[in-house]
C-alpha cells in the first residue's frame, strides 16, 4: 500500500517538516520554544478573531465595547484575559528563543536568523498597535508618546507622524487604522514563520554542542512531538493560571480609565516586554539620539553573526562567553526594571549605565571573549 503521508502533495510537506524530519538526538528543552511560539500565535489569532467580532474601533465606543466583551459576551472575559496574557507568554517565549540563538550560536544560520529578527520586529509592532485598541489612558498616551518619536526624524518627521495619525494628533483615524494593522499583521507573521521554518529546514537544527549532528539524527516524530507536547501543556498551564487567577497583574491600572487627551498619567510606560527598549530610549537626553538607540537595541541582533569571533559555535564549552551572556541577561532584566521606574535619580544613572553595558557587551566584550578563548585553546608548547 502507498503511504499517503509520503506521496500526497500537501501531506508530504507536513511529513518532511514535522514527522520524518531528521533532528539532532541531543537538542534540549531550549529547542521547545519554536513550537511554543507557534502555539502562542495560534492562540492569539483565535482569541483575537473572536474578540474582533465584538470590538468597535471608534474612539467613542472602543472602551465600552471592551467592557461589553468582558461583561456581556459569553466567555468574553476569558477571551480577553487569554489574549492579553497570551501576548506576555508570546514575548516570554520570544526572548528565551532569541537567548537560545545567541547562547548556542544558532545565528550562524544567517537567513533563518535574519527572518527571525524581522519576525521579532513584526510581533513588536503588532503588540504595540494592539495595546492601543482598548482606548484606555495608557493605550492613548502610549500611542501618543511612541508615534511622536517619528517627529524626531529630520525634515520629514512631523509630516510622517501626522500621516501615521491621520490628523494632527492620535484620534479616531489612528485607532481605526491601528485596528486594521492589528488584524492583518498576525497573518504576515504566519507567512514569515513559514519562511523562517523553510530556511531552518535547509540546514537542519543546530544542537547544544554546536558540532555538525548529521552522524546522529533521529526522526522528529515521536521523539520531539511528545517533547513539544509536554512543553505545550506547561505553557498552557502557566497561561491559564495567569489568565484565570491574576489576569490584570501584568497590565497597567491606568488602562481601566477611558482615554482622556486632557489628563496625562503621572508615569507613561509601555507593557513589560517593551520596558528594556523604553529604558534605552529614555537613557539618552536627546530625542533623535534616543530614537536611534531604541532602533539599535533591536537591530543590533542583525549584526551578531558578523561579531562571532570564536572557533567554536556554541557557548557550551566557553566559560568566559557564558559569563558575559549571563551578565547580558541580568543587564536586560535591570533595563526592564528601570523602564518601569519614574525619571529621577538614581534610576536615570542606572538606566544610562545599563544601556551602555548592553551595547558594550554585544559590540566589544563578547567578540573579545571569543578571541581570548581561541587564544587559550591554542597549544602553547
From Swiss-Prot:
Keyword Ion transport: no
UniProt-listed PROSITE patterns: CYTB_CTER, CYTB_NTER
Membrane-spanning residues: 33-53, 77-98, 113-133, 178-198, 226-246, 288-308, 320-340, 347-367
Pfam families named in the record: Cytochrom_B_C, Cytochrome_B
CDD domains: cytochrome_b_C (cd00290), Cytochrome_b_N (cd00284)
GO cellular component, one term: mitochondrial inner membrane
Signal peptide: none
Binding annotation for a ubiquinone: 201
Residues binding heme b b562: 83, 182
InterPro entries linked: Cyt_b/b6_C, Cyt_b/b6_C_sf, Cyt_b/b6_N, Cytb/b6-like_sf, Cytochrome_b, Cytochrome_b_C_euk/bac, Cytochrome_b_N_euk/bac, Di-haem_cyt_TM
UniProt: heme b b566 binding residues: 97, 196
An example Gene Ontology molecular-function term: metal ion binding
Entry cofactors: heme b
Keywords: Electron transport, Heme, Iron, Membrane, Metal-binding, Mitochondrion, Mitochondrion inner membrane, Respiratory chain, Transmembrane, Transmembrane helix, Transport, Ubiquinone
Domain of life where this protein originates: Eukaryota
Free-text cofactor note: Binds 2 heme b groups non-covalently.
GO biological process: mitochondrial electron transport, ubiquinol to cytochrome c
SUPFAM superfamilies (alphabetical): a domain/subunit of cytochrome bc1 complex (Ubiquinol-cytochrome c reductase), Transmembrane di-heme cytochromes
Membrane topology: Multi-pass membrane protein
Subcellular location(s) per record: Mitochondrion inner membrane
Role played: Component of the ubiquinol-cytochrome c reductase complex (complex III or cytochrome b-c1 complex) that is part of the mitochondrial respiratory chain. The b-c1 complex mediates electron transfer from ubiquinol to cytochrome c. Contributes to the generation of a proton gradient across the mitochondrial membrane that is then used for ATP synthesis.
Similarity section: Belongs to the cytochrome b family.
Miscellaneous notes: Heme 1 (or BL or b562) is low-potential and absorbs at about 562 nm, and heme 2 (or BH or b566) is high-potential and absorbs at about 566 nm.
Subunit structure of this chain's protein: The cytochrome bc1 complex contains 11 subunits: 3 respiratory subunits (MT-CYB, CYC1 and UQCRFS1), 2 core proteins (UQCRC1 and UQCRC2) and 6 low-molecular weight proteins (UQCRH/QCR6, UQCRB/QCR7, UQCRQ/QCR8, UQCR10/QCR9, UQCR11/QCR10 and a cleavage product of UQCRFS1). This cytochrome bc1 complex then forms a dimer.
Protein name per Swiss-Prot or TrEMBL: Cytochrome b
Gene designation: MT-CYB
